[in-house]
């Protein structure tokens, strides 16, 4: 639980609900749970009593925040499969912007270009999917091997994203991480369902330079959090986030 909460804090998920399910064989101390969340600096509401589904639904809706501005389309894909008679279908959520039938899109990384054949939201055919929607995107004209977990769909011609192979970052280390990174350490970066392997080549104070085995796709404007972990770091694998991307 502790590492999960550190991941939430690092991802800046400051608001949420934690529901305590009391089992018949063991009892969970709500005050202890509140202490753990307090130590993680997460101001989530702790729910002790059972809620009706509609009550919990209303609580979740209360967390909804409208995004400002007209962000470009980004759809991180977590599943891909083929449907006979339709073709390649990607499943993901609309992180920003909107996507419509017949839009010309591009798959990043790779730059494969295709056209949206159809869209489904909640198993219903739709003409358009907006930010926050969980969407199935059927594509025409793309190689099935160009789409997979960690792929991102954007509008063709968009300059929203960039691929970096070696970059210098500011490392924002979580206060729970006692281990210190060193040159030649192998780290992993997680963003938008990508999980990339990199090696640290230079350290200068809070700044670190990382060479990635395969390109890391990030937003050009620097928004979007990149979580850095080290899989053999025990007991805490999460180091924090990197920001201020500067390609080498």
Language model: regions and residue ranges:
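Signal for well-folded cores of large energy- and translation-related assemblies
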Residues: 9, 61-68, 82, 95, ...
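Long, hydrophobic alpha/beta structural blocks
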Residues: 10, 14-17
